Amino acid sequence: MAEVLLFEALRQGLQEEMDRDPRVMVMGEDVGHYGGSYKVTKGFAERYGDLRLLDTPIAENSFTGMAIGAAMTGLRPVVEGMNMGFLLLAFNQIANNAGMLHYTSGGNFTIPIVIRGPGGVGRQLGAEHSQRLESYFQSVPGLQMVACSTPYNAKGLIKSAIRSDNPIILFEHVLLYNLKEDLAEEEYLVCLEKAEVVRPGNDITILTYSRMRHNVLQATKSLVYKGYDPEIIDIVSLKPFDLGTIGASVCKTHKVLIVEECMRTGGIGATLRAAIMEHFFDYLDAPILCLSSQDVPTPYSSPLEELTVIQPNQIIQVVEQLCEN
């Protein structure tokens, strides 16, 4: 066992897959000799050379399209978006090419591409660098989406994503890169379609992912002290949802709270709430509540920035409200 930071876990997983499979390559802005904006690819330029680690111009549409073409012709590219907000510049390539080409080619092409990078509200990164784009890509047919929240699942997810023949977006949160965890030296994978039951409980199901997992766990300390027994599930897979794990919890607790950093209007929480209502309505004893970020651009001011995202005290209040009714 060795203590590893989340960005180091991503690096380990990526390195293991590049060592295992010579078809795996990385491209993006500053991923080469600089080592990536958050040092996930540090040392890779010397280890793998310029053919497998490609520094690109600042042109997301161009290098994302190039990566999709590389995937169509047999490579397994990993694209690093320096910031998830910049992927809007490549939305056409991701939506109309990566997501659809397997279908529109009649199955003649697979697109084994991984698109990864940091997003979410950081510390005064400003509106354009604090984007949460999960729901933008959720509606694209053919894409899979996962979100890491710990060093353990970050490493396992990136390895599984690289081995998949589907186009996958791996969402990483900018504030979690320095999160520490002891990881075993043995190889492991994390299922791309499976939610994680972080804490079993009986009173209420709390569904969350990414950074909000840690806000929920912080709130849970106070909730347990007050006598509540929440079940916490990190949904991990943002598309498709693991309705088996989620449904089993809903049928047990009969109450659901969704906690996300995505925007309230059209966010992941809204889609997840609709899915639960469709499949498990008869098991609910109360309305599903969803705590989401405010529908505003993220302010630069630190106090205002904090007000736009969900805090542990808000989670405590809503759990008490649901459990007392």
From Swiss-Prot:
Main location: plastid
Top-level taxon of the source organism: Eukaryota
MF terms (GO), sorted A to Z: metal ion binding; pyruvate dehydrogenase (acetyl-transferring) activity
EC main group: oxidoreductase
A GO cellular component entry from the record: chloroplast
Cofactor(s), by name: thiamine diphosphate
EC number(s) on file: 1.2.4.1
Positions with a binding annotation for thiamine diphosphate: E60
Subcellular location: Plastid, Chloroplast
Catalytically driven reaction(s): N(6)-[(R)-lipoyl]-L-lysyl-[protein] + pyruvate + H(+) = N(6)-[(R)-S(8)-acetyldihydrolipoyl]-L-lysyl-[protein] + CO2
CDD domains: TPP_PYR_E1-PDHc-beta_like
InterPro entries, sorted: THDP-binding, Transketo_C/PFOR_II, Transketolase-like_Pyr-bd, Transketolase_C
Biological role: The pyruvate dehydrogenase complex catalyzes the overall conversion of pyruvate to acetyl-CoA and CO(2). It contains multiple copies of three enzymatic components: pyruvate dehydrogenase (E1), dihydrolipoamide acetyltransferase (E2) and lipoamide dehydrogenase (E3).
Family annotation (NCBIfam families): PRK09212.1
Oligomer and partners: Heterodimer of an alpha and a beta chain.
UniProt-recorded name of the protein: Pyruvate dehydrogenase E1 component subunit beta
